[in-house]
């Protein structure tokens, strides 16, 4: 899924995003 992929990238890119989209990271 493009959405999941983008989420993973964002999460790995910045820790701030990780906290904001931790669910996406865990899901991916």
UniProtKB/Swiss-Prot annotation:
EC number: 3.1.1.4
Keywords (A to Z) from UniProt: Calcium, Hydrolase, Lipid degradation, Lipid metabolism, Neurotoxin, Presynaptic neurotoxin, Secreted, Toxin
GO biological process: arachidonate secretion; lipid catabolic process; phospholipid metabolic process
Tissue: Expressed by the venom gland.
Cofactor(s) it depends on: Ca(2+)
Cofactor binding summary note: Binds 1 Ca(2+) ion.
Compartment list: Secreted
Database matches in InterPro entries: PLipase_A2_dom_sf
Single annotated GO MF: phospholipase A2 activity
Chain coiled-coil ranges: none
Keyword Secreted listed: yes
Catalytic activity annotation: a 1,2-diacyl-sn-glycero-3-phosphocholine + H2O = a 1-acyl-sn-glycero-3-phosphocholine + a fatty acid + H(+)
Record-level GO cellular component terms: extracellular region
Purpose of the protein: Snake venom phospholipase A2 (PLA2) that inhibits neuromuscular transmission by blocking acetylcholine release from the nerve termini. PLA2 catalyzes the calcium-dependent hydrolysis of the 2-acyl groups in 3-sn-phosphoglycerides.
Sequence similarity: Belongs to the phospholipase A2 family. Group I subfamily.
Name the record gives this protein: Phospholipase A2 3
Lineage of the organism: Eukaryota, Metazoa, Chordata, Craniata, Vertebrata
